[in-house]
Amino acid sequence: MGSEEDKKLTKKQLKAQQFRKSKEEKDQEKDVKKEQAPEGKRPNSAAGNDGEEPVKKKRKTRRGRGGKGKNGKKGNRFIVFVGSLPRDITAVELQNHFKNSSPDQIRLRADKGIAFLEFDADKDRTGIQRRMDIALLQHGTLLKEKKINVELTVGGGGNSQERLEKLKNKNIKLDEERKERLTKMINDGNQKKIAKTTATAAQTSGTDNKPVPAGIHPDRAKLLK
């Protein structure tokens, strides 16, 4: 009888040990999950437990365009997209190509053949539009014998219909402005050429109208000038 009771007690003890073990394992799993959880998302522990204060959630800060930049200032950046780049392009080569527009920052993704030119309005409020225009005028120029694509982009990312429509309208307007600028440049250049030709012709005619000395053939008189 005594041996049977010992066996029963042993079974009870085993069950108790297994119960304690499973409870300990569950507690450990909870602790691991708490440690792996991102800071700010961990459950708050009650004040007084283990003498620790409740964990305070950290407030996330937004980065990029529209978010707060350094020293709490609001970011005011404009981005120009550059596509169809050669895969072996370097940051130095790209910077040299766009040196006249002087972008404040260049983010190159050579493996995808794209780059982003950032212009900071807080650094240059008066000249930022001119610098962006210079960069955008390089649309279709050759870089390492490859024609590149330069256009405005809309901040925020994503492929929502509203964003794509906004981007499309911006680039249509930009293309029209680019054509107008090129036409104006051509017309200005032609006017300068016409003015130069007219001035040269006036000088030549003024020289030809000089009186020819008596007794000398006009052709010989030209040689004597």
Curated annotation (Swiss-Prot):
Residues 1-75, 187-225 are annotated as: Disordered. Residues 78-155 form the RRM domain. It is found in: Nucleus, Nucleolus. Residues 21-42 have a biased composition (Basic and acidic residues). Residues 9-20, 56-75 have a biased composition (Basic residues). Present with 8970 molecules/cell in log phase SD medium. One of its GO terms (biological process) is maturation of SSU-rRNA. This is Nucleolar protein 6. The gene is NOP6. GO terms for cellular component: 90S preribosome; nucleolus; small-subunit processome. Predicted to be involved in rRNA processing. The modification Phosphoserine is found at S45, S160. It comes from Saccharomyces cerevisiae (strain ATCC 204508 / S288c).
